[in-house]
Amino acid sequence: MKEDNKTYVDTSKVSIREINKAIAKDMIVTYHYSHAWTMCRYALGIFYKTDELDILGNDEQLIGVAVYGFPVGRSAVTSIIDGLGNDQCLELTRLFIHDGYGSNIESYALGQTFRWMREHAPNIKMLLSYSDPFQGHLGGIYRATNWLFQDTNKIQLMPNYGISLEGEDGTYIHSRTVFSKWGSHNLEHLKTEIGKDGYKEFWRRKEMSKLRYIQILPTNKGEKKKLMNSLKHPCETPPKDISDILPKSERYETYEPENMVNFW
């Protein structure tokens, strides 16, 4: 449903087609918030039809790009779904569109990339994408384009924990830094070592992994049912607020350092 206070893109002026990867790289490195290129199998340019011709006689302007690459890791796909190989799945690694083309331009353009895949890469049966909640990305664009959501934080076999010395709502030290600073993730060890640093308490919280979104690209209803049944983990309603998925922190008291007696 369209909202009165929003501007929407004229979808008749938007088109998608594959572009040179060098052009896509330049756009991503220049404009994407990461300013970093990534793995790329298909670079799909997002074009907008203009009312005037440019100096080369073109009536379309490149306003964005969607970059899809093969997932990294031997078991990247098989850990998610049975029956598909790594060459049948792509990951949306970058998406950038210039501002000023309507509030729904991202969702419309992303949906058009699904159509492009079905037509030009029919061997691709599943798309993946990840959002980082601690970067403020909960995946609103994926909700708008009907991706399936899996809470990877419930799938972790060996979760990592961050430590706060500033209270429950303070800054949490990353697990890698915790190990580097205190030599272990063992809770009893941390109680001792953090106590030696003069702290009487600390808070520990499970670190969140990136949220996983899945788009199935079946050729028919039967294949869709088969692919859905082959997913190894349940799909859930995607979160709308980080508080919906933020792990609870736990408070611990440290051990007081033993009095050291010097013998002379």
Question: Residue locations for each model-derived region?
Answer:
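A positional "C-terminalness" feature that preferentially activates on distal terminal regions of long
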Residues: 13, 210, 217, 242-243, ...
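Short amphipathic alpha-helix that is part of the acyltransferase structural core
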Residues: 1-40
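Conserved beta-hairpin
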Residues: 28, 41-68
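Short hydrophobic/aromatic beta-strand or adjacent loop that forms the aromatic wall/cage
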Residues: 41-43, 208-213
